[in-house]
Structures are given as structure tokens and as C-alpha cells.
Amino acid sequence: MDPNILWQARNDGSALQEEDIQQLRSSIRGTVVLKNEASEEEYNAAVTRWNNVSIRLATLVVYVEDEQDIVKCVEFVNKHYLDVAVCSHGRHSYHGASSSTGMVIDLGRMRRVSVDKEAMTVTAQGGCIARDVELPLEAEGLATVFGAVNETGIGGLTLGGGVGFLTGAHGLAADNLVSARMVLANGQVVTASDDENSDLFWAIRGAGPNFGIVTEFKYRVHKQGPVFWQMLFYSPDKLKDCVSIVNQMHNISLAQKGGDFQVMMAYLTPPGYPDLHPGLRIFYNGPEEKAKELAAPAYALGPLSVSGGMCNFSDTTRIPPYLEFEGFDRYAASSAHLDYPLDENLLLEVFTMFRNVIHKYGHHLLHPSKCILDLRNYEKVASVPIDATAYSGRFDVAWMIPDLQWDDPAMDSTMRMEVTSITAHIRERVREAKGGHVNGPRDATAIYPNISAGGEEKAKSVFGPNLPRLQVLKRKYDPDFIWNKWFPIVPA
């Protein structure tokens, strides 16, 4: 089936009549913001995203109040054959995740959370951001797995896999999902779990945006106390020294059974400095003394500055001060995997490429533009069979993530090209190292979907060997290809 035929058949709703809009409004409790009717301020607020590159001028945005509102919206989409996108919170580098020129169903008003300490679960509505769930859990001495930033919507994060600093201990956010209540493409409301609609439950844990709108997530939770959290920045001349210890740091992480010690490397310009500096982010789910013992190689390099210490877990998912800037809210990010042991020469090549981009475009790029080397322990993720859920990236690999941030719309395509050229170089070098192929089910082009631009042509890189089964399930649950954003799966 040609996805372009299905996409082109859907319309932007510009031909909707006033009576159509009134019918929608009268059928829901929520609010309809109409492009040609709302004030400029109201409309801009409805379509603005964390990444301004992602803004699409939707004909109508519906702020739903409850599950029944979502059902009515889906029925309206089907009746008028509209293009549609779903916005949990809109914090993604790719526009297709939550923007549409037709209808946007915005879940932002659905943020109720309920903690069941006896059952060790938490239930959260689909419009929650991670902080909405983290804080009430923390008050009970509990936590579940979300991402690195607590302003991220739990919907897209969970349905695409979801990795964070507790992933080493507890797996993906999707691995901690107990059940999900969903509105399907035909407007039907179902529960997906191991016991109900188990094929759908398999699919949404890694490919969820392709199968419906989750109105309610239920997660397993875990006991959680204070953690150790520090950011170490080094002088620019220490880049090679930092790279020289990354394999050692990863091996130390692997040696700590339980996944409690996690490390990430960053290459960015800290506030008050004129150029890029290497940095290491240290996380340990335990006491400071043990953390510093494990991270001894990082401290031995002589950091220029050290910030952080023992803190609540929720403090680790706040955006750090050195990344908080007003404006410069246009982003491009991509990802590519690297196998252990990491090739230090390749890492230096990549960091040099990134530095050249920063120097080339100078004033266009904000200081928080960064290149991240994710060294976190993915053994727990890799211990789950690749076909156990739709999420196929079940390997203990490192991820390189170039992330550019700018403010001039004229630079959008250039910045996207620069980011993808870096990850394309990595993938080519990975292929060369493996003689043009890889062993097993992982392709050298594999990407992490929650930090990459979407597109149907990349579905194979995201879903790997699980794609054929997903295409069959897509035909069952969304034969008309309503959910065609993010990394769309074409029905078999």
C-alpha cells in the first residue's frame, strides 16, 4: 500500500462548514480553537511547540477534557477525513509527533494522577508530563522510569520506548507499563495489557503512536531514595582525555549489578565560557562516597568545575541551569548507535565535526547546542528479547546525539542537514567496521525514535525485525492510516 496515496487523501479541514464546527463543539466538554476565528494570541498558544521548527498551522485544535471528548474528535476526523495529530505535551524535535495542518487533539488538560502504594502502581492520564507523576511518587518514596527531562509528555515518551537514568535498574518506560486505556482509529475504547488485547499491548510498547490515543497509563513503581548527581566540566584541551576513559566508565557501570551507576558525556559551551568544553554527567542511585569511588577516573582528570551532589531523584530530571536560555527555540537532533568497545578515534572525529559546525555558524547557534554521548547501562533493556515488545533497540550500545539549537527560521534546513550529516557519518563508519553488514537483527542504521526526525522511510531503522508484525497489526487497528505521524507504519 502506497502511504502517499493515503496521506494525500486526508484534508486539512479548510472546507469545513460553520455547522460542522458547531456540531463538534456541542458534542464535547472541551474547547475548539479555530484558525480563522481565534485571536492571534489564542491560536499561537494552541499551535506553538517546544521546538518552533515543529509548528504547523492546524485548522483546528481541540483541547479535550476527557476520554469521551477524544472519541468524538476521532469520529469527527473519520467523518470528514481530516489529517490529525495528537499532542501530549509537544516536546519533540520532529513536527509530525504532535502537529498537523488539519486537527490537533491536545491532551494537555488531562493530567490526573493516582498512586496506589499497596499495588505499587501509578495511573496517569495521557496529558501528563513526567513531573506530574514524579513528584507525587517521590512524596511516597517511589519512582518509575521516565526520560532525562521532566517537562516531557509521558505519552510520546512511553509509546516510543522511554529511557532515563532509572533504565539501568528497571528498563524502559514501556517495560514498566502495566496497561493502557486507548481510543482506537474507529473510536472504540479498549484496554491493552498482557490479559486484554495483548497484541495491541505488544505494539504500543515501542510503536504506540501508530495505534491510537492513550487516555490513561498504568505503570509499575519502585522504591526510590536520594541519589548522587554531578556534572563535571573540563577544559577544552581535556577532550581527548575524557574520550580515553569512556570505555572504562562503561565497564565500571556494567560491573555494578543493578544498573545504579550511569554516565553520559557532553560536549557543549557552559555559560560564561567562549568555546566548547567536554563534560561528564555522573548518576548513582546510592550514597555519595560510593559514587565518587566508582567515578574516580572522571575526577582524576581534574575537572574545571563540579556542580551537584546528593539530591532527590526529581532534581536530576530538571533542565539544568547551563541549558536554560530564553529564545533560540528551534532544535534539530538525531541519533546513531555505537558498539562497545567504543572507537576513540571515531568519537574524536565526531566531536571535531560538531565543533566545526559550531564554529562555522557561530552567532546562529546558542550555547546549549550540544553533542551527547550516552554511555548509560542498557543491559536491563537488552535482557528482554527483541520480539517481546515492538521496541527493537534492545542492545547494550552507546548513542551519539548531536543536538543544535538556534533562532533564525532561515537556518532550519541547514541545521537539519548538519545534524543528519554527523549521524550519517557515524552509521557509515559503523558499517565499515562491520565489513558492510551487521550480525543479528540490529541494522547499522538503527535509531532511537524519541530523539530523531520521523518519516515512513525510517520505520525499518526504528522497528527492525518487528516491522512486519507491526504492519499486520496496523491493518487490524488502523487500516485507514489515520495515525500517520512520527514513524508511520504502513498497513500490510
From Swiss-Prot:
Induction: Expression is significantly up-regulated at the end of late growth phase, in the presence of Butyrolactone I. Expression is positively regulated by the pgm cluster-specific transcription factor pgmR. Its EC number is 1.1.1.-. Keywords: FAD, Flavoprotein, Oxidoreductase. It comes from the Eukaryota. Pathway: Pigment biosynthesis; Secondary metabolite biosynthesis. Its cofactor is FAD. GO terms for molecular function: FAD binding; oxidoreductase activity. Residues 54-224 form the FAD-binding PCMH-type domain. Disruption phenotype: Only abolishes the production of pleosporalin A but not of the 2 other final products. FAD-linked oxidoreductase; part of the gene cluster that mediates the biosynthesis of pleosporalin A, ascomycone A, as well as a third cryptic naphthoquinone derived pigment, all responsible for the coloration of conidia. Essential for the production of pleosporalin A, but not the 2 other final products. The pathway begins with the biosynthesis of the cyclized heptaketide 3-acetonyl-1,6,8-trihydroxy-2-naphthaldehyde by the NR-PKS pgmA. Belongs to the oxygen-dependent FAD-linked oxidoreductase family. This is FAD-linked oxidoreductase pgmH. It comes from Aspergillus terreus. The gene is pgmH.
